[in-house]
Design a protein with these regions (language model features):
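Helix-start/capping segments and mature chain N-termini
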Residues: 1-105, 127, 134-339
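Charged, gly/pro-rich active-site loop segments
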Residues: 96, 105-119
Length: 339
């Protein structure tokens, strides 16, 4: 095995030993199979290639100070993948099989789970897609589930820090009654040009408003948004937003900290009233927002004058990571400790 510099891992793909596969045909899922190949063959007329029948997930495994490996809320990822399968008319992958695949992949690649002190983790990527050959626009009759893992470094190389976002109304994340609530590749392909433009302008990512009226906050890049004011954790409610497992967890922790939690429509003007703001998701847990510039109105909403994260964001970030790594007790049954 190559010598891995655990303290300087980036957030990218690195080959590991094994991946898990499962095929669906004749109306049923087969057994889980272990493969050491990074490649597979697929029919050139597969529905995934032509009509976007695809969904994926992202979750992590962490090595604790006690040496034990913990996987965070994989049951929630299994359910969300089933929702995405429903939304794209794919065969639903059973929750028990999903969790078995995660466990098997992490155990088989245990040597790639980074040491506790590195702050790194093992990223787990399940993907489900149509492999059946179809020329007409219709669901495939055959599907494949693949799950691979790769070690990734902490999202913030220079420590927990704020970044700027930009509102650009020329871009929509998804249609009002479209696929935004599902974790499908097409949503991410559609965001690439907006993300690139934001980066070119010096921002970490784009800040989306609702596609119908451009009045309400939707998402920030590929992450959920939250704002903090008057001891209240506020996050947008919309059928276009992917239900974030991280955001769901942060809402629970905020309530435990004595905060009020509101999930509702958030008008863009309300940005001016927030004491703190952040984007949340699997990759970073929380990405604190330094400011949000409105490209069209030239308005700027500043949440951190000194560039440092706010106290609530920092407390929530540290609390959730402590649970993930086993530094604090898991009182919610979120973590699966692998034997």
């Amino acid at each position: 095995m190559e010598n891995i510099d655990w303290n300087n891992l980036g957030f990218g793909y690195r080959k590991t030993d094994y991946n898990i596969r499962c095929t669906y045909k004749d109306g049923a899922w087969g057994d889980l199979e272990v493969s050491d190949s990074e490649y597979f063959t697929m029919h050139m007329a597969a529905s995934a290639i032509h009509y976007g029948q695809e969904a994926f997930e992202g979750l992590k495994a962490f090595r604790g100070k006690d040496g034990k490996i913990r996987v965070f809320r994989m049951d929630e990822n299994a359910k969300r993948m089933q929702d995405s399968a429903n939304g794209t008319l794919m065969a639903r992958f059973p929750q028990e099989k999903f969790m078995e695949a995660v466990t098997k992949a992490v155990k088989l690649n245990e040597r790639f789970v980074p040491p506790y002190e590195s702050g790194a983790s093992l990223y787990i990527r399940p993907v489900l897609f149509g492999t059946g050959a179809e020329i007409g626009v219709k669901p495939a009759r055959e599907y494949m589930f693949i799950l691979f893992v790769t070690p990734v470094g902490p999202y913030f190389k220079g420590g927990f820090q704020t970044t700027p976002f930009v509102i650009m109304r020329e871009f929509d994340r998804s249609a009002p009654l479209g696929m935004g609530k599902f974790k499908v590749g097409g949503n991410y392909a559609a965001s690439l040009i907006a993300g690139q433009k934001a980066h070119e302008l010096g921002y970490s990512n784009i800040f989306y408003l609702d596609a119908k009226e451009k009045k309400y906050i939707d998402e920030c890049g590929a992450a959920n948004f939250f704002g903090v004011k008057n001891n209240t954790y506020i996050t947008p409610k919309s059928e276009s937003i992917l239900p974030s497992i991280t955001n769901k967890s942060l809402m629970t922790l905020a309530e435990e900290m004595g905060m009020k939690v509101e999930c509702r429509h958030v008008p863009v003007e309300e940005l001016a009233t927030f004491e703190e703001a952040g984007a949340c998701g699997t990759a970073a847990v929380i990405s604190p927002i330094q400011r949000i510039d409105d490209y069209d109105t030239k308005e700027s909403y500043v949440f951190s004058k000194d560039g440092k994260p706010g106290p609530i964001s920092e407390k929530l970030y540290n609390k959730l990571r402590a649970i993930q790594y086993g530094d604090e007790p898991d009182n919610h049954g979120w973590v699966t400790v692998l034997d």
